[in-house]
């Protein structure tokens, strides 16, 4: 989720008026903070949605803890009732998407499943990898890895200005941000990163 918009605002500044940022935040109270921050910064190139991305359209329940960065989709009916929608139903197919940034507290696989058509026009995904959070939803990094590979991505860890490809058997940190990239040459050209051998 976009939370209060720290990354959303930074990305909006980076792409400028010719670019567009689309952000999603399911928690109604946090969504109001997001909206307020966008208004306060007078950003016109941001579109926001008060819902959770999922692999199905409907409703779900969302936690409401004080540490709002830890809120997540619940498997039970406790919490705040929220709308869920598939990424594919936003019909974002007119223009290529340079970057999909995703941090949904372990719900990543379901977001990707609901956006399988959209993934065809995305070159790069920045996502949080936390195996213990995936277990809350009864899948593993191995399942996520396979799904991304089947959709023509290669997975990389990064440090400083270097990316290094990882494999299903690679040892990862307990919590780590990763990149899923289709066109490596384009990514390296646009970012000035280098590829580790």
Q: Model-derived features: where do they sit?
A:
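Phosphate/nucleotide-binding beta-alpha loop and adjacent structural elements of enzyme active sites
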Residues: 2-197
